[in-house]
């Protein structure tokens, strides 16, 4: 370990940021999994309003992560696009039944 004070502080800051970033990413992954799992249940009830509310909550968390620099803006866009596509597919599946 370094004895230089600035190097020690820099290491502490990087570890702190790593923990924060990991918790943000974990929260996003958890919300995405919950949303994907709830899509089938909500579409069985034909409740698109609740689906859009849950989708907006996930979008909000992704946008916050992009704003804070945890995710790159392109990665955030890809995640949001994937979620919208999943919702669209599940809605079309319900309409065909």
From Swiss-Prot:
InterPro entries: Ribosomal_bS20, Ribosomal_bS20_sf. It comes from the Eukaryota. It is found in: Plastid, Chloroplast. Residues 1-15 have a biased composition (Polar residues). Residues 1-20 are annotated as: Disordered. GO terms for cellular component: chloroplast; cytosol; small ribosomal subunit. GO terms for biological process: translation. Keywords: Chloroplast, Plastid, Ribonucleoprotein, Ribosomal protein, RNA-binding, rRNA-binding. SUPFAM superfamilies: Ribosomal protein S20. Pfam families: Ribosomal_S20p. One of its GO terms (molecular function) is small ribosomal subunit rRNA binding. PANTHER family: 30S RIBOSOMAL PROTEIN S20 (PTHR33398), SMALL RIBOSOMAL SUBUNIT PROTEIN BS20C (PTHR33398:SF1). Binds directly to 16S ribosomal RNA. Belongs to the bacterial ribosomal protein bS20 family. This is Small ribosomal subunit protein bS20c. The gene is rps20.
